[in-house]
């Protein structure tokens, strides 16, 4: 802050637009960034970071720049690799940008379903 500032750092921080929240701390703990934007020129060229919990690379995108969990993410699966299993507590919609592969899902009763996907596939 400039030496001749009219307000203290403490007061200025109360008006900061980028607030830290439990959600932003969780994303940071995942090792990922959040892109706050309404428009991204190409999802294929987003900067991705290693995502240890998922076993791939990723970045979160927050549509409303509201720094809350109203978001989506880009996740890259390396060729001939797989993501770590994840239990879903919510619905998730997947759109495949490129590549092809297969996914296995199972429910609490143990029923497993495997299906194949490719670029342009959409599944939930």
Ranges and model annotations:
Residues 72, 91, 112:
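Short coil/loop residues immediately preceding or within conserved phosphate-binding loops
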Residues 77, 107-124:
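Short acidic-glycine-tyrosine-enriched beta hairpin
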């Amino acid at each position: 802050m400039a030496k001749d500032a009219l307000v203290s750092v403490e007061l200025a921080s109360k008006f900061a637009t980028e607030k830290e929240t439990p959600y932003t701390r969780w994303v940071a703990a995942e090792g990922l960034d959040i892109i706050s934007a309404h428009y991204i020129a190409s999802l294929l060229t987003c900067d991705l970071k290693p995502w240890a919990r998922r076993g791939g690379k990723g970045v979160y995108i927050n549509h409303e720049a509201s720094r809350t969990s109203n978001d989506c993410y880009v996740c890259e699966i390396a060729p001939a690799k797989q993501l770590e299993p994840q239990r879903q507590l919510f619905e998730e919609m997947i759109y495949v940008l490129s590549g092809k592969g297969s996914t296995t899902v199972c429910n609490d009763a143990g029923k497993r379903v495997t299906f194949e996907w490719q670029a342009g596939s959409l599944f939930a």
